[in-house]
């Protein structure tokens, strides 16, 4: 054997030995014998239920998909997966009409819709708490009603049990609240505008009663009281204020021309709040609204001094908080 041939053989042996050493260092799952590029991907793979330490017996009982060769630990999971191969998306979102293969995919999608809303009711029986943000009602269920993600949560309307507060909230607001809205008759034009009673008596209390959608509209009774801030505002704007004795009746009736115009036409607004851009067709309503803004801090409540931050939080605070309107400006 020539010297050059001997060198070629030794080089081949060294290369083969190096390849054997490199292959021995390749990360490999000891359960399913699958190889990975690095230890990080191997650790991620080992978290899978079929390849966790101590679960090697599961490998011998895998259920394999005939379409894509994926394997599952039980038959229900295999059937759930096979729905994606059927090509039929039978689950439809009632909000955006998007379709899905499986119920769990639809539930995750509805949860995203739910978090975009700005009004949430507590789904617990005999609890009337309402929230502006999704995080508020979810924390309320966990902290106040002591629901957890490891125990079933019951629906206050149909008493069904759900695996988490999130699933309960999706069920309650889409299955019950949406069904209630769709079954309710469309309100007439006169029902959309609740009767408004405006009183200029010296009562120290102003009451705002906003009827929920499930109930017929109620009267919105507002007393101006004897607040120094309102009196000062009235004096400064006396030239633009209507004569309440002649032009403002105690109760607006749908038969009155001014009320009928609100229904049949779109009049040009005369008064607008410079802070929250709410427009009014009546100077008295504009006065009452402007008196709620604290001087120098537009989103601070002039009644109780609460700092609200923006116009949405400010509006919800005025509607839901218990206030003594007679103390405005004092």
Curated annotation (Swiss-Prot):
**Residue ranges of the C2H2-type zinc fingers?**
27-48, 63-85, 91-113, 120-144, 153-176, 271-293
> What top-level branch of life does the organism fall under?
Eukaryota
Xref: InterPro entries = Znf_C2H2_sf (IPR036236), Znf_C2H2_type (IPR013087)
A single GO BP annotation from the record? regulation of transcription by RNA polymerase II
Which SMART domains does this one have? ZnF_C2H2
**Residues annotated as region Disordered?**
183-203
**Expression across tissues:** Expressed in the somatic gonad.
* Compositionally biased region (Low complexity): 183-195
PANTHER family recorded for this chain?
C2H2-TYPE DOMAIN-CONTAINING PROTEIN, KRAB AND ZINC FINGER DOMAIN-CONTAINING
| Name of the protein described by the UniProt record | Zinc finger protein sdz-12
